[in-house]
Structure formats: C-alpha cells, structure tokens
C-alpha cells in the first residue's frame, strides 16, 4: 500500500482507515491502548538519551505536548527535581495516563490543533511533529507559540535527516511516515517550520539514542 502514497502523495492511511490513523485511534480505544504501549516501549532508550544530553533542571514548569502516557516527562522530572510537569494530550490518552499523576505532574486533556495549551517554561514535543505535514505541523507550533511565555524554550525531539545522499534510518522512517501523512525533516526544514510559527531556531543537540533535540525560542 506504500506504492499508493509514493505515486499519489496521498497518505495510504486515509484510503484504508476512516479518519486516517489518528481518527481511527481516537474512535477505537483498544487500538489506541496498544499503540500507546508500543510507543512507550519503543521510546525507553530514546528517553534515556534525551535526558543525558540536555539539562532540564533550569526549568520550573515543563510541558510534554502530545506526551502519551508520560514516560518522557517522568524521566525528565527525575532529572529536574525542582520542576513541575504538565502532560498534555487528548482526553482518551490522558485517561490511560492517570497512573503517572503526582504532586509534581499534572494531566491536561486537550487538542493541540485547537489551542488551550498550558503556560510552561519548556515545551517538549517528542516524535509528534513528524506525524504531520508542514501545514498541520505549523498550526501545532503556532498554538504552542500562543501559549509560550517570552522566556520559554521549544524542544522538538525527532530523528533528523542529515544533509547527505547516504542511506540512514531517518530516511527509511520518512517513507513510513509518508503512508500516514507525516514526514521526517532536516534541521533546516525544522528551522523553517519554527520561523513560520513564530519561533527562532537556536541549536541542534544530538543524542546517543538516534534522535536529536531541536531547540527554539519565541521570536
């Protein structure tokens, strides 16, 4: 079915699933549960690499946007003992994450396409933006920007496509993402997304876990 996407540019998921991948998951709780568990398991090694590569202790309030069951935010808060965290995701996802709630970690249900995001010092989006095309990704980031204080930082965590012609895992993943309507991006493409959404790119921090942290600040 990938051939359909390669030939037409139209996500295969929209052809075989009503509402595409995300519409299907939102209306099928069991499928959503399995998907969230799979993403949590896959991300364990990546999360360790992210926490090792970045100093989160400088933030007071850290928002994990589209954070699933909170595995990233939990580890980040362990590395930043003075910080509080806000886990932001759709209602059906947040309900499955109730076990991570604590005096330092609160849950907020919402839709990042509609806004109403929490006010934080740092916004984490781990493997969220690659799920969406440029138009939708820009809309998400603009909604983050609407909530973001002037001093805050935006931290996008993704596998980045290098500017070279060689084979790589991010390029292979890019084909998979095509089937659901998303894409992997180069650092320059993220910088352009940032600019279109009201952020300025500051730096790329590579980790030992196959993902990079793309940092930005409000423009």
Q: Where are the language model's segments positioned?
A:
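Conserved Class I S-adenosyl-L-methionine-dependent methyltransferase catalytic core
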Residues: 1-60
């Amino acid at each position: 079915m990938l051939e359909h996407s390669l030939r037409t540019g139209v996500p295969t998921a929209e052809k075989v699933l009503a509402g595409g991948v995300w519409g299907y998951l939102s209306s099928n709780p069991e499928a959503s549960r399995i998907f969230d568990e799979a993403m949590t398991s896959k991300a364990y090694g990546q999360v360790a690499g992210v926490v090792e590569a970045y100093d989160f202790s400088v933030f007071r309030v850290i928002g994990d946007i589209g954070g699933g069951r909170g595995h990233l935010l939990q580890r980040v808060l362990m590395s930043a003992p003075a910080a509080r965290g806000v886990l932001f995701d759709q209602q059906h996802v947040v309900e499955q994450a109730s076990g991570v709630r604590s005096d330092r970690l609160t849950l907020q249900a919402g839709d990042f396409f509609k806004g109403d995001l929490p006010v934080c010092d740092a916004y984490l989006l781990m493997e969220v933006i690659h799920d969406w095309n440029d138009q939708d990704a820009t809309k998400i980031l603009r909604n983050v920007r609407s909530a973001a204080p002037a001093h805050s930082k935006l931290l996008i965590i993704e596998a980045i496509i290098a500017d070279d012609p060689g084979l790589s895992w991010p390029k292979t993943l890019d084909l998979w993402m095509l089937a659901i309507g998303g894409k992997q991006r180069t650092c320059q493409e993220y910088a352009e997304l940032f600019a279109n959404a009201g952020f300025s790119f500051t730096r790329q921090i590579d980790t030992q876990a196959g993902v990079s942290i793309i940092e930005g600040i409000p423009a």
